[in-house]
Swiss-Prot record:
Protein name (database record): Large ribosomal subunit protein P2
Name of the gene: RPLP2
Quaternary assembly: Heterodimer with P1 at the lateral ribosomal stalk of the large ribosomal subunit.
InterPro entries: P1/P2_N_sf (IPR038716), Ribosomal_P1/P2 (IPR027534), Ribosomal_P2 (IPR044076)
Organism: Homo sapiens (Human)
Molecular-function GO term, any one: structural constituent of ribosome
Length: 115
């Protein structure tokens, strides 16, 4: 990621085709040593490409990656129907859980395990 960021920084700074020397200079300015193999890989992949197009393609690829929230949303409607009939029981369980939590917090007498 550091090599891509340095390449983009050089390209956005006006250098349309940054070399390995340019990127090493950027990395050295913040105290990062460059790995020549990775650096050459980034340069070979990005050399000659329009940076704005590369960023737009990356955003498109990230948008197609599924997010973790979609699974929970799809499961909720199927489980909502059975839960509607047992709402009072669920409320009682929640009250019991709250009581148990308060008892557990008193067990340590206000002191945490690692304090």
């Amino acid at each position: 990621m550091r090599y891509v960021a340095s390449y983009l920084l050089a390209a956005l700074g006006g250098n349309s085709s940054p070399s390995a020397k340019d990127i090493k200079k950027i990395l050295d300015s913040v105290g990062i040593e460059a790995d020549d193999d990775r650096l050459n890989k980034v340069i070979s992949e990005l050399n000659g490409k329009n940076i704005e197009d590369v960023i737009a393609q990356g955003i498109g690829k990230l948008a197609s990656v599924p997010a973790g929230g979609a699974v929970a949303v799809s499961a909720a409607p199927g489980s909502a129907a059975p839960a509607a009939g047992s709402a009072p029981a669920a409320a009682e369980e929640k009250k019991d859980e709250k009581k148990e939590e308060s008892e557990e917090s008193d067990d340590d007498m206000g002191f945490g395990l690692f304090d």
